[in-house]
């Protein structure tokens, strides 16, 4: 039906009132392209939208069951997440957290240009990944070619990114992620030692900068074995950087404890040399044996009773007496230098 009325302006206004019968007879508007009713029954005829329960009661298409968007409800209390299957895509596959922890425990980061150059020349197979800043890459051309040929990942990054990757601002423009070395036993060491062999044994010394300085002195004076409680102490980034390449010329030796280690060396014909500011003989007036184990970190009096032997050689480094003594790293250089002078020079 329709009605019309005249407004004050004289214009005719027409109002259309749609009947319930016409609810399904909406016509298509040829001008706008819109219009046209939805197929189905009108609400007047009892038509209504299907309720949610009705939808759930309808059988689902089989394609829905195979859909990747389908959600699966987990029973209450079943909180164990399913292992994600990413089709073997690298970097996406499930990684066992225990495997990841073990892998990280076996790796360490080495930085410093001299340290990384020496490590590449000595054991390139230990390198897992590398980071460089652009300015050092010309000096690492050989390493870059080797890593590319052996599918080792490397990244050329800026200073901020390298600081983050190495964990220090003292990275020297390069950082390697490497596999740690394992220590050798005393028995393995003495079986291949020569007639002249000096071994450095450290008791309760873990400062990485001291360790780095001592490894540098060892490399300079031909001392190849260093006894430590944990071989990883010689693999820390700070120690290797401080050694300036010297870490690649020494091998960690490990044992149950200092008592057993020294006993094993004594039985193999080595003389144990300790320091003692009270009972020691002046170093530069003492003959040092060709095969010896130099114990540092504790003076003779500070070692466990079971580790001391009356036949051990005790020495001291004479000086002015203006200070209590030398830093352990400096003392190592003096002692090893005298052994080199007497036995190698």
Curated annotation (Swiss-Prot):
<dbReference type="InterPro" id="IPR004441">
    <property type="entry name" value="rRNA_MeTrfase_TrmH"/>
</dbReference>
<dbReference type="InterPro" id="IPR013123">
    <property type="entry name" value="SpoU_subst-bd"/>
</dbReference>
<protein>
    <recommendedName>
        <fullName>Uncharacterized tRNA/rRNA methyltransferase YfiF</fullName>
        <ecNumber>2.1.1.-</ecNumber>
    </recommendedName>
</protein>
<keyword id="KW-0808">Transferase</keyword>
<feature type="compositionally biased region" description="Basic and acidic residues">
    <location>
        <begin position="18"/>
        <end position="27"/>
    </location>
</feature>
<dbReference type="InterPro" id="IPR001537">
    <property type="entry name" value="SpoU_MeTrfase"/>
</dbReference>
<dbReference type="GO" id="GO:0008173">
    <property type="term" value="F:RNA methyltransferase activity"/>
</dbReference>
<dbReference type="InterPro" id="IPR016479">
    <property type="entry name" value="YfiF_prd"/>
</dbReference>
<dbReference type="Pfam" id="PF08032">
    <property type="entry name" value="SpoU_sub_bind"/>
</dbReference>
<dbReference type="GO" id="GO:0005829">
    <property type="term" value="C:cytosol"/>
</dbReference>
<dbReference type="InterPro" id="IPR029064">
    <property type="entry name" value="Ribosomal_eL30-like_sf"/>
</dbReference>
<dbReference type="Pfam" id="PF00588">
    <property type="entry name" value="SpoU_methylase"/>
</dbReference>
<feature type="region of interest" description="Disordered">
    <location>
        <begin position="1"/>
        <end position="98"/>
    </location>
</feature>
<dbReference type="InterPro" id="IPR029028">
    <property type="entry name" value="Alpha/beta_knot_MTases"/>
</dbReference>
<dbReference type="GO" id="GO:0003723">
    <property type="term" value="F:RNA binding"/>
</dbReference>
<keyword id="KW-0489">Methyltransferase</keyword>
<dbReference type="GO" id="GO:0006396">
    <property type="term" value="P:RNA processing"/>
</dbReference>
<dbReference type="InterPro" id="IPR029026">
    <property type="entry name" value="tRNA_m1G_MTases_N"/>
</dbReference>
<feature type="compositionally biased region" description="Basic and acidic residues">
    <location>
        <begin position="76"/>
        <end position="86"/>
    </location>
</feature>
<feature type="compositionally biased region" description="Basic and acidic residues">
    <location>
        <begin position="42"/>
        <end position="68"/>
    </location>
</feature>
<dbReference type="GO" id="GO:0032259">
    <property type="term" value="P:methylation"/>
</dbReference>
<comment type="similarity">
    <text>Belongs to the class IV-like SAM-binding methyltransferase superfamily. RNA methyltransferase TrmH family.</text>
</comment>
């Amino acid at each position: 039906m329709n009605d019309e009325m005249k407004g004050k302006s004289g214009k005719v206004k027409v109002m259309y009132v749609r009947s319930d019968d016409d609810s399904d007879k909406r016509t298509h508007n040829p001008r706008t392209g819109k219009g046209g009713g939805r197929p189905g029954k009108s609400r007047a005829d009892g038509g209504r939208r299907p309720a949610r329960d009705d939808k759930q009661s309808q059988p689902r298409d089989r394609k829905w069951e195979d859909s990747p968007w389908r959600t699966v409800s987990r029973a209450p209390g079943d909180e164990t997440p399913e292992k994600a299957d990413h089709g073997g895509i690298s970097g996406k596959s499930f990684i066992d957290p225990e495997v990841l922890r073990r892998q990280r425990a076996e790796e360490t980061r080495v930085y410093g240009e001299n340290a990384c150059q020496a490590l590449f020349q000595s054991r390139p197979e230990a390198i897992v990944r590398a980071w460089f800043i652009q300015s050092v890459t010309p000096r690492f051309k050989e390493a870059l070619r080797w890593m590319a040929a052996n599918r080792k990942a490397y990244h050329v990054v800026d200073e901020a990114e390298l600081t983050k990757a190495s964990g220090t601002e003292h990275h020297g423009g390069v950082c390697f992620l490497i596999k740690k070395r394992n220590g050798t036993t005393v028995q393995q060491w003495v079986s291949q030692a020569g007639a002249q062999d000096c071994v450095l044994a450290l008791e309760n010394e873990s400062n990485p900068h001291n360790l780095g300085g001592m490894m540098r002195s060892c490399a300079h004076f031909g001392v190849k074995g260093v006894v430590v409680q944990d071989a990883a102490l010689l693999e820390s980034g700070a120690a290797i950087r401080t050694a300036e390449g010297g870490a690649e010329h020494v091998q960690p030796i490990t044992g149950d404890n200092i008592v057993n280690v020294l006993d094993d060396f004594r039985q193999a014909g080595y003389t144990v040399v300790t320091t003692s500011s009270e009972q020691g003989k002046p170093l530069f007036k003492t003959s040092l044996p060709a095969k010896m184990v130099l114990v540092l970190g504790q003076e003779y009096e500070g070692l466990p009773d079971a580790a001391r032997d009356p036949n051990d050689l005790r020495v001291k480094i004479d000086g002015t007496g203006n200070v209590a003594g030398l830093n352990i790293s400096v003392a190592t250089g003096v002692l090893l230098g005298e052994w080199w002078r007497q036995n190698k020079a």
